[in-house]
Amino acid sequence: MSHHWGYSKHNGPENWHKDFPIANGDRQSPVDIDTATAQHDPALQPLLISYDKAASKSIVNNGHSFNVEFDDSQDNAVLKGGPLSDSYRLIQFHFHWGSSDGQGSEHTVNKKKYAAELHLVHWNTKYGDFGKAVQQPDGLAVLGIFLKIGPASQGLQKVLEALHSIKTKGKRAAFANFDPCSLLPGNLDYWTYPGSLTTPPLLECVTWIVLREPITVSSEQMSHFRTLNFNEEGDAEEAMVDNWRPAQPLKNRKIKASFK
């Protein structure tokens, strides 16, 4: 049953706990970021993002989003600094989005939903590989970036132009020479808290770093995301929309801010 999770009524986030009991755990993601209670922590360092040698390889429809995958066999694209004590290697990025522009993000800010959310997924190199890292409480660092409606994003355009070739689950296409820096906002102020993967197996292995400044995307660009399908080729067509998990209880955690 575990591989049948999704985002519909019968297999969506409300039901994930049946197969993945950690869904009700103490450090689940996403969360609502309440800016009034997030505490500025002067000890937090600036983020150090070195994506200059990032080697993108392919773009894949996995039936719940699409991943742009990177060569993580060496330190090509690295995230460190911020709340992190170690160096983390970029393995993939993906997005979550809505059926309309009024929803789609997983994290919310004072309950406000953005049109989409970008997740750049990195693993802690001290654990040797991604599979080992996800078993550790400090195994992953995920950089979350909100997408809000405004002027079109040039960086995003190259990604969107590849989507026609991966319309259905299981499709994969080559996707080289993409610079993930083109998806970063100008300001790297962030919130950070300990959390989890937002999709099954929902492992509690993520240091979340959510940027305060969104990037902008046009409404027309957003509509491209919705041309993808959850289903495999030849099956009944199900538009890939609303592939986001709602905010989870913060429980005993504190959200820290890198800015005043």
From Swiss-Prot:
Q: Name one GO cellular component term.
A: myelin sheath
The cellular location(s) given in this protein's UniProt record come to:
Cytoplasm; Cell membrane
Q: Which reaction does it catalyse?
A: hydrogencarbonate + H(+) = CO2 + H2O; urea = cyanamide + H2O
Q: Does the keyword Nucleotide-binding apply?
A: no
Q: Which residues carry this modification: Phosphoserine?
A: 2, 87, 165
* Active site residues per record: 64, 67, 127
Q: Which residues bind substrate?
A: 198-199
Positions of modified residues (N-acetylserine): 2
Question: Which Gene Ontology molecular-function terms are recorded?
Answer: arylesterase activity; carbonate dehydratase activity; cyanamide hydratase activity; zinc ion binding
Outline the subunit composition: Interacts with SLC4A4. Interaction with SLC4A7 regulates SLC4A7 transporter activity. Interacts with SLC26A6.
Query: What protein family is recorded?
Result: Belongs to the alpha-carbonic anhydrase family.
Instruction: Please report the name of this protein according to its UniProt entry.
Output: Carbonic anhydrase 2
